Amino acid sequence: MIKQRTLKRIVQATGVGLHTGKKVTLTLRPAPANTGVIYRRTDLNPPVDFPADAKSVRDTMLCTCLVNEHDVRISTVEHLNAALAGLGIDNIVIEVNAPEIPIMDGSAAPFVYLLLDAGIDELNCAKKFVRIKETVRVEDGDKWAEFRPYNGFTLDFTIDFNHPAIDSSSQRYAMNFSADAFMRQISRARTFGFMRDIEYLQSRGLCLGGSFDCAIVVDDYRVLNEDGLRFEDEFVRHKMLDAIGDLFMCGHNIIGAFTAYKSGHALNNKLLQAVLANQEAWEFVTFQDDAELPLAFKAPSTVLA
């Protein structure tokens, strides 16, 4: 059978919090089968757990948060969640000694390296996928996102940014998902923001960790980072990275075709909730062997080495 995945060993890293600008220690721990993805704040006494759940997601101007019933939150979970989706990690406990996951370089790549350093272990329990059975679409003005039935996982994302630094030909990105494709094509794409927004937020004591080290920064005319872009279409690739993380908030890889136009965290989450709320639109599936498994989710040698 296709088995659930966790880590082989505990790994730790430090980084800076986007909101506070302070040092954060991140610890990733293996977890037993059927634990799911659990974020844990160890700076609170007692520690507070936040299971990944579409209904717990709140979108703020700076990041995605998980909020519990007592209005306690953990922030900036989206890029790590994308790395978990990319490598198909089903069970993990993620600890931080702060109210937020460190921003690292603004992409998912540092988290991918950390997960691969921990090693991926298979558990003796069937991995559950969410398979889309009916088309579900959500809209917000001219923005929209939808899932259609498809035996695999494809993503097709279009942005519409009128900015000299973003070429009109680099506003759409489509790909057939796989762990390899995620690592090579998506994981290194960084978040982006306007210099004026960062300066304004910092003047109000917010976004204190925001810098050229953890984002693509633009003014009205150009990219300000000395090293420029990692990809010509890094902006839309990062929006796809965000979507992969947002859609994994159900804790399961999804089998279906995702298409979006000008979508963001809030609309991606609205789509995920709309799918899960309609029992006719999806089902849990497991697979007995690789022959049945959609190509998108076959583990590359780098993951299960």
Swiss-Prot record:
Top-tier EC class: hydrolase
Reaction it catalyzes: a UDP-3-O-[(3R)-3-hydroxyacyl]-N-acetyl-alpha-D-glucosamine + H2O = a UDP-3-O-[(3R)-3-hydroxyacyl]-alpha-D-glucosamine + acetate
This protein's GO CC annotations: membrane
Keywords of the record: Hydrolase, Lipid A biosynthesis, Lipid biosynthesis, Lipid metabolism, Metal-binding, Zinc
GO terms for biological process, alphabetical: lipid A biosynthetic process
Active-site residues, record numbering mapped to chain: 265
Pathway: Glycolipid biosynthesis; lipid IV(A) biosynthesis; lipid IV(A) from (3R)-3-hydroxytetradecanoyl-[acyl-carrier-protein] and UDP-N-acetyl-alpha-D-glucosamine: step 2/6
UniProt-listed Enzyme Commission number(s): 3.5.1.108
GO molecular function, one term: metal ion binding
Cofactor: Zn(2+)
Binding sites annotated in the UniProt record for Zn(2+): 79, 238, 242
Record-stated family: Belongs to the LpxC family.
PANTHER family per record: UDP-3-O-ACYL-N-ACETYLGLUCOSAMINE DEACETYLASE 1, MITOCHONDRIAL-RELATED
Free-text function comment from the UniProt entry: Catalyzes the hydrolysis of UDP-3-O-myristoyl-N-acetylglucosamine to form UDP-3-O-myristoylglucosamine and acetate, the committed step in lipid A biosynthesis.
Name of the protein in question: UDP-3-O-acyl-N-acetylglucosamine deacetylase
Encoding gene per record: lpxC
